[in-house]
Amino acid sequence: MQYKLLMALSKLVCLLPHGALLAIGKVLGHLYYCLISKQRELAIRQMMQSLGISRSEAEHIVKASFVNLAQNVLEILYMPRLNKENFSKYIKIDHPEHLTDSLAKGHGVVILTGHIGTWEWLAAGLVFLGMPVTAIAKPQPNMQYTNVLNDLRATCGVEIFSRGTSELLAAARALRKGKILGFLADQDGGPAGAFVEFFGRTASTPMGPAVFSRKFKSPVVPTFILRQPDGGHLIHVLPPMELHDTGDPDRDLIEDTADMTHIIEDIIRQNPTQWLWFQHRWNTPPDEKTVHHHVTAREGEADGKKG
């Protein structure tokens, strides 16, 4: 029932012009800010601590971030309207050569990104630009929501692999075939994550981008989509990362993850209204850290070979 309702809502949303969609999102975002006090207070508290700003400043930015989130949700439902002919009306890209040159090396590309801007449109925009895009995504607690998201992504030609499942084997094959594999690397990584600094605090961080890059010799290209003042979107592509190679694979993995986290932090600092500040990003305390397996063990998992 939820699946049918959401897909019906998507069809209704797709009847609207994009400008009307953004206007509705603005109203819904303000309502969300006023009504959902738990997430609002968590976002304000985390922003004050992370950015070192006053409560009034944080309230202003968080309100704008809730508007951005509401617009994001509507734009996700709007994805069936996007196609190769019209996407350039909504999405621009800078420095695509960082991606095309990296793809030309033949080892696939790991895209490092986060829940910034309308992140679902990032993969869609790259597909319409002619790039072979796949991504790893965390399944939603409600499987019907996951199915809705995956079906909307499929309308734009984006292939999704579920995190924490056997589909990671298919993700590995995608890199072997020279495709792009995207990672949202700004969530809590649990006890098995790398504990690195994020906004001045130790945070468990997913190591997937570093692990897959190391295993398949794939360049890591930080890529983000940012909402612009006119309501459009810019895919912002940074140069490929210089990864560590000290001869200590475990240490290199942690250092690479730390560098990736710093890049995401810098983008958030530059665009604080476009991140999900109510995420439980610092949910796993450092004392829950588990012993990391050697990188080669993780590489075996990526290949489906468990010791």
Annotate the PLM regions.
Residues 28, 50-63, 101-103, 128, ...:
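Non-catalytic C-terminal accessory region of glycerolipid acyltransferases
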Residues 68, 105-165, 171, 191-196:
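Catalytic core of membrane glycerolipid acyltransferases/transacylases, capturing the structured
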Residues 86-91, 138, 157-163, 199-200, ...:
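Short, flexible loop segments at the rims of nucleotide/cofactor-binding pockets, characterized by
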Residues 8, 20, 43-46, 122, ...:
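Hydrophobic alpha-helical segments typical of transmembrane helices
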Residues 1-113, 155:
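Membrane-anchoring hydrophobic helices of lipid-metabolizing enzymes
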Residues 38, 93, 117, 143-144, ...:
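Residue-level recognition of alpha-helix initiation/capping sites
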Residues 35, 90-91, 114, 141, ...:
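Residues that cap or flank secondary-structure elements
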